[in-house]
Design a protein with these regions (language model features):
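Conserved catalytic core of the tyrosine transesterase superfamily
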Residues: 1-257
């Protein structure tokens, strides 16, 4: 088919063909990408209309996200077990702490430059580079303040426009000038979790979910958590709230056989 010949039925047939191979959220993501592509073609006057605009994806509703989270004591144990006598240890503690205490997305954290850690009103703040080029400023928890400044000082990060979280130069123990990738961060997190015997299959997003859950568990308000996490909707923030997991566990332990 040529581009002008594509009609809604063709897009709908493609979406239907994905069922059985992909989960509903993944199918909806595919459809969203197709819509965006055709929108771009319409704006560029390549096509007169978007054939995907009227196509609906599969129904999907979730009250709780699937991201694995840690208990507060597990997160504390993981952070405290990091050997901060090394630059890489200081870097890893700072990155994990950033995600826990600011609810930062991994992409926003890794996009930070050195100048994105700054002082305002006698407090340390961070500037997160969020989706679609949005900047999101957050004040630092006192622990995060310590983690960031210890890392920046030890690594001698003085160039404001340079990456904050960098890869290492082989086994030299020195930082390179290249920013960490999400794959680098994931491998680091899995390694740190294994070091302390955490068997939960956590990943880059787990610390964001852990931070939100613990904030709400200690009396934080959902609408404030939404602002801190930079979510468009409080419903999205609610997907990260795992307080009911502990309630459920307490209840099932009532079954005495």
């Amino acid at each position: 088919l040529s581009l002008p010949a594509i009609e809604p039925v063709h897009v709908a047939t493609y979406v239907e063909s994905l069922k059985g191979h992909l989960s509903p959220p993944s199918i909806k993501q595919h459809l969203a990408a197709i819509r965006m592509l055709f929108d771009w073609l319409v704006v560029g006057q390549v096509l007169p209309s978007n054939p995907a605009s009227s196509v609906r994806g599969p129904k999907y509703s979730s009250k709780k996200g699937k991201t694995p989270v840690l208990m507060a004591d597990e997160a504390r144990m993981l952070i405290e077990a990091i050997d901060v006598r090394t630059i890489v240890g200081l870097r890893d503690r700072a990155l994990i702490g950033l995600m826990v205490y600011t609810f930062a997305r991994i992409g926003a954290a890794l996009a930070m430059q050195v100048e994105d850690v700054y002082i305002q009103g006698r407090r340390t703040w961070v500037r997160l580079h969020e989706k679609n080029g949005k900047l999101h400023a957050m004040p630092c928890h006192h622990n995060l303040d310590e983690y960031l400044h210890a890392y920046i000082k030890a690594a001698q990060l003085t160039e404001g426009k340079s990456p904050l979280f960098r890869t290492m130069q082989g086994r030299t123990g020195k930082l390179s000038g290249k920013p960490m990738t999400q794959v680098d961060a994931y491998r680091m997190i899995r390694r740190r979790a294994a070091d302390v015997g955490i068997r939960t299959k956590i990943g880059n997003h787990s610390f964001r979910a852990t931070g939100i859950t613990e904030y709400l568990r200690h009396g934080g308000k959902l609408e404030i958590a939404q602002q801190m996490a930079n979510h468009e909707s409080a419903r999205t923030t609610g997907l990260y709230d795992r307080r009911t997991d502990q309630v459920s566990l307490d209840e099932v332990e009532r079954i005495v056989i």
